[in-house]
Structure formats: structure tokens, C-alpha cells
Regions:
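A short His-aromatic
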Residues: 87-88
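A short glycine-rich, Lys/Arg-flanked "PGG" loop and its adjoining helix->strand segment in the class I
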Residues: 93-105
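A conserved beta-strand element that flanks and buttresses the S-adenosyl-L-methionine
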Residues: 81
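Conserved alpha-helix/loop element of class I SAM-dependent methyltransferases that forms part
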Residues: 1-14
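C-terminal alpha-helical "lid/dimerization" subdomain adjacent to the S-adenosyl-L-methionine
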Residues: 108-163
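C-terminal lobe and adjacent flexible extensions of AdoMet/dcAdoMet transferase-like proteins
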Residues: 163-169
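Class I SAM-dependent methyltransferase SAM/SAH-binding core
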Residues: 15-69
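Short glycine-centered segments of the SAM/dcSAM-binding site in methyltransferase folds
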Residues: 15, 107-108
Length: 169
């Protein structure tokens, strides 16, 4: 969560939506930086766990939903995160259309995925090859996002792809 918060420069003016939030670590990281944050996950059990371990409840909301169907109002988010979850999305195009819908003008998107090698199988394939990262960036551009960049970076010792961009103002 800290890497995502740094890469998107999250602060008190932000409303962060984390798609596929799991136990909510990154949602809490956003709240610690003063942002209001919503964790979205398809798993009610994960959301129960996230609620149970969250102390600062006033800045955080948990909702059941998927990337393709975000239960949030139009233009309500300034930042949307997908951290190691895009490879699980059923329909990336539909998910990006939903992200675009919930993002306010100038809103930022960040997707982080573990770097994987072409031809990897099993758990080693959970993530993106360089080509998959570039393909996701191209899809972001095709939905009207600007300043879309693909960066190679590290989350701890793990090499990750960071794809970020924003909506025009």
C-alpha cells in the first residue's frame, strides 16, 4: 500500500478506491495519509476481515463489488488502485470503463502487477509480462486516459510493473 500511495502521491484531498482490496492494507495506508478510502472486493469474507482489523473507521468504507461493476457514484474518486488484481479481472475493457466512470476529472489510476516471464505457469504466471503491461497501458489510453506510463519498480524485493495515468482535467 505504501508504494501505491507514493506513486499516486495520495494526500488529504484524495478519495481513493482500491479494487480487489482483500484485507485492506492499502486502504488503511491511504487513510493514514489523510485520504478518504473505499475498499472494493468481491469476497464478503475478505471485507469482514478488513473491517475487523481497521481501527480508524471514519475515513474508510468497505463495499462488495467487482472491477466490472463498481457500486460507486460517477466522478466520486480521485484515485483508483488495482494492486496485483488486474490479472484476475474477467473483462479488462469493462473494468476500465467503470474506472473511468467513477474517476473525477484529473483522477489518477494505478495498476501494480508482479513481473512475470512469458510462458510462466501456475503461481509464477500471476502477474504481467512486459508485453501485458504495455497492452494494459494501451487499453488505458484507448479509454481516454492521458500521461499513461509503464514503469518497472520494486515492492520490497519483488519486481513489479506499475502502470499509471490520469483522466484529462
Amino acid at each position: 500500500g505504501r508504494l501505491a500511495a507514493e506513486l499516486t502521491d495520495v494526500g488529504p484531498a484524495d478519495v481513493v478506491v482500491h479494487i480487489g482490496c482483500g484485507a485492506g492494507n492499502a486502504v488503511r495506508a491511504a487513510a493514514r495519509r489523510g485520504a478518504r478510502a473505499t475498499g472494493v472486493d468481491p469476497s464478503a469474507a475478505m471485507l469482514r476481515m478488513a473491517r475487523a482489523v481497521t481501527r480508524r473507521r471514519n475515513a474508510v468504507t468497505w463495499v462488495e463489488g467487482s472491477a466490472e461493476s463498481l457500486p460507486l457514484p460517477d466522478g466520486s474518486a480521485t484515485v483508483v488502485w488495482a494492486l496485483a488484481t488486474v490479472h484476475h479481472w474477467r473483462d479488462v475493457g469493462a473494468a476500465l470503463a467503470e474506472i473511468r466512470r467513477v474517476l473525477a476529472p484529473s483522477g489518477r489510476i494505478l495498476a501494480l502487477e508482479k513481473q512475470t516471464q512469458p510462458g510462466a505457469t501456475g503461481r509464477a504466471s500471476h502477474g504481467w509480462t512486459a508485453q501485458q503491461a504495455e497492452s494494459f497501458a494501451a487499453l488505458c489510453r484507448s479509454t481516454g486516459m492521458v500521461e499513461v506510463e509503464v514503469k518497472s519498480t520494486h515492492a520490497g524485493r519483488r519486481a513489479v510493473w506499475a502502470v499509471g495515468g490520469r483522466l484529462p482535467s
